[in-house]
Regions:
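Substrate-binding pocket helix/loop in short-chain dehydrogenase/reductase
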Residues: 90-92, 98-103
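C-terminal helical subdomain
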Residues: 174, 190-231
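Active-site helix of classical SDR
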Residues: 114, 150
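Conserved NAD(P)H cofactor-binding loop of Rossmann-fold oxidoreductase domains
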Residues: 82-87
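Conserved glycine-rich Rossmann-like NAD(P)H-binding loop of the short-chain dehydrogenase/reductase
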Residues: 24-40
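Residue(s) in the substrate-gating loop at a strand-loop-helix junction
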Residues: 134
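Conserved glycine-rich cofactor-binding loop
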Residues: 10-11
């Protein structure tokens, strides 16, 4: 059996990545912040599931996770660096400590974990890394003004790392979901925005499937979502930043 690591596996896109990698025959190391990660094995059958509860916004949490991987004494074939969060609201009002926590999870923690994963896979000259970023990487993100840049960082990181890892036989793919029906926007305190309703958003199972298909096809990136999402991403590559910022604010600006 091959082994796959998925961060943010207790919910949403990460949960679907874990479930679908299990269906593809991978043993799973699934990571989440809260105790609900311990239920992951109830949803995946026929493979080994190792749940890890760790705070990936901290160096200690990353080292705790990596110690689990090392104790398994098995090669890691797939790593999905997926855990992330947002914080909605006007930058004037949002809490700085919460923003710094988000940067610690979405950027610093990802880089810390990637360092371990990349060295491990380069030693073996094999492996595949899927980095979940966002269509928000393609636009300014008013009312999520720190979140969007964290996704741009991860997209640029993924594309650069991909080039470096080619000579080691390690693949790197970026998954850019459009708005997806998960806990994400509620957790970000965005219930009072258009993004706050899950009614119109993409199915996380579809987004995960597209990510995994692109990963195994060796693509550099993939937009996650339906045709409208892919059309919107293509449009965003042509519009000016001020126009995109106004368009994004229509969905992210609090209505109350
Ligand atoms: N949903 C969207 O519209 C959307 C669009 C574009 C990109 N994305 C990206 O997709 C990724 C997954 O988001 P999602 O929509 O699936 O969100 P979600 O349903 O809220 O799931 C977030 C996952 O991350 C885990 N997590 C949160 N903070 C953590 C921490 N400090 N340490 C370890 N794990 C932590 C959560 O664990 P607990 O459940 O235990 O808290 C959960 O498993 C994110 O990187 C996000 O930027 C989402």
């Amino acid at each position: 059996m091959d082994l796959a690591l998925i961060t943010g596996a207790s919910s949403g896109i990460g949960f679907q990545l874990a479930r679908q990698l299990g269906e593809r025959g991978y043993d799973i190391v699934g990571v989440g912040a809260s105790a609900r990660i311990n239920d992951l094995g109830d949803h995946i059958s026929g493979v080994e599931v190792v749940p890890v509860q760790a705070d990936l916004a901290t160096a200690e949490g990353i080292e705790q996770l990596w110690a689990v991987i090392e104790r398994l004494e098995r090669p890691l074939d797939v790593a999905c660096l997926n855990a992330g969060r947002s914080l909605g609201g006007a930058f004037l009002d949002t809490d700085l400590d919460e923003e710094l926590q988000m940067l610690a999870l979405n950027v610093t923690g990802q880089v810390r974990l990637a360092k371990h994963v990349v060295r491990h896979m380069a030693d073996r000259q094999a492996g595949r890394i899927l980095i979940t970023t966002s269509c928000s990487a393609l636009t300014p993100t008013p009312y999520e003004s720190i979140y969007g840049p964290t996704r741009s960082f991860m997209l640029s990181f993924a594309e650069g790392l991909r080039e470096e890892m080619k000579e080691y036989g390690v693949g790197v793919t970026a998954l850019l979901p459009g708005a997806t029906a998960t806990d994400f926007h509620q957790t970000a305190g965005m219930g009072n925005t258009k993004f706050g309703s899950n009614d119109w958003k993409n199915d996380p199972a579809l987004v995960a499937e597209q990510g995994l298909d692109a990963l195994f096809a060796g693509e550099d990136h993939v937009i996650g979502g339906d045709q409208a999402t892919r059309d919107d991403a293509a449009l965003n590559r042509t519009l000016s930043d001020p126009v995109k910022a106004t368009k994004f604010a229509q969905a992210s600006r609090p209505t109350t």
